[in-house]
From Swiss-Prot:
PANTHER family: AT29763P-RELATED, CHAPERONE PROTEIN DNAJ 49. The keyword Acyltransferase does not apply. One of its GO terms (cellular component) is membrane. Plays a continuous role in plant development probably in the structural organization of compartments. Belongs to the DnaJ family. C/III subfamily. SMART domains: DnaJ. Keywords: Chaperone, Membrane, Transmembrane, Transmembrane helix. It is a single-pass membrane protein. The gene is ATJ49. This is Chaperone protein dnaJ 49. The chain crosses the membrane at residues 237-257. Its main location: membrane.
Length: 354
């Protein structure tokens, strides 16, 4: 019962936000939902506020894009377009759908493996490099969000409780807390969500398949014999590449292996915090007594180890800053905490254009 009251209060907060933004339909929807969850709630004032609003569809931008798609249907018959009616229908259905399970064509009891397979299949069909239909970028982003949400246990449970994409995204943004300055966690439901990063993570270098096919068509005829040689040798090379990791694993199994002396990030094995003396960079060790015995304070061994910590952390900041700057090209509002820390710690000689 208390859970229903909490959900009802949350619905009222969403309704209040909708009223402020002038979205009458959304406000009434969540007012009614709150009333069903907790009949004792008084919603007369909110209903009265809704009566003073003109109904504004919060999906107007999507509707305009769909109308543009409809207008382009006639152009498909001229043969000038680089997409088919099937491409348009696929993009249109994904954009209109408000259920992550339905977008991927899955049931609610599906496994993580089924989610991954569905994403691999659908993302290839809707990727903007392959599907040139209007709205393919938005559809590709929505497919990536569906995969990211459902493949994570916590976000999937939260979505199952809500069941609607729009409300789920709204709750994610509303519940977001101010981030710590050097937080490295990826939040896939804010403005810095990058569908290409998800695609590269799942497919790896297979991302280049679209560009490779284009390059093949633009080569000069005198290089055709080279292309045939590559095509013939391709499968055998691919087989070797696939088998190579297994040989490496077998080799590593018989090699002597020693645990690292430290880790920049806390985990089950490294939980004891330490800090470098001058730069105050945090790192973690397995055992405080064993570490201090092996690396006494003010010893050359301790100085060398802390030098490695600083070097590794500096490299981590550079890599993280590079990713932040790439994302910032898409959205200027994206924060760049790692770039700021690089400058604050004096790890760079020049100002980073943020």
């Amino acid at each position: 019962m208390d859970g229903n009251k909490d959900d009802a209060s949350r619905c009222l907060r969403i309704a209040e936000d909708a009223i402020v933004s002038g979205d009458k339909e959304r406000a009434l929807k969540f007012i009614n939902m709150a009333k069903r969850l907790n009949p004792s709630l008084s919603v007369d004032e909110l209903v009265a506020a809704c009566d003073n609003l003109d109904s504004v569809s919060r999906n107007s931008s999507v509707s305009e894009k769909l109308k543009t798609m409809d207008g382009d249907d006639d152009k498909l018959e001229t043969g000038k377009m680089k997409y088919t009616e099937e491409n348009v229908d696929l993009v249109r259905n994904i954009i209109r759908n408000n259920d992550y399970y339905a977008i991927l064509g899955l049931e609610k009891n599906c496994s993580v493996d089924e989610i991954r397979k569905a994403y691999r299949k659908l993302s290839l069909k809707v990727h903007p490099d392959k599907n040139k239909a209007p709205g393919s970028e938005e559809a590709f982003k929505k497919v990536s969000k569906a995969f990211t949400c459902l493949s994570d246990g916590n976000s999937r449970r939260q979505f199952d409780q809500v069941g609607i994409v729009d409300e789920f995204d709204h709750v994610q943004r509303r519940n977001r807390r101010p981030r710590r300055r050097y937080n490295t966690r990826n939040d896939f439901f804010d403005d810095e969500f990058d569908p290409e990063e998800i695609f590269r993570t799942v497919f790896g270098q297979q991302r280049e398949v679209f560009r490779a096919s284009h390059a093949y068509r633009t080569r000069q005829p005198r290089n055709q014999f080279r292309e045939e040689e590559i095509n013939v040798a391709g499968p055998s090379c691919l087989t070797i590449i696939q088998i190579l990791p297994f040989f490496l694993l077998l080799l590593l199994a018989y090699l002597p292996f020693s645990e690292p002396d430290y880790s920049l990030h806390k985990n089950q094995s490294y939980q004891i915090p330490k800090t470098t003396q001058n730069t105050e960079i945090s790192f973690y060790v397995r055992s405080a007594s064993a570490f201090d015995e092996k690396f006494p304070l003010s010893s050359s061994a301790r100085a060398n180890l802390e030098g490695n910590v600083i070097k590794e952390y500096k490299h981590f900041l550079f890599q993280s800053c590079r990713i932040e700057l790439q994302k910032r090209r898409w959205n200027k509002k994206i924060p760049t905490p790692h770039c700021i820390e690089l400058q604050d710690r004096g790890f760079v000689d020049r100002h980073i254009p943020i």
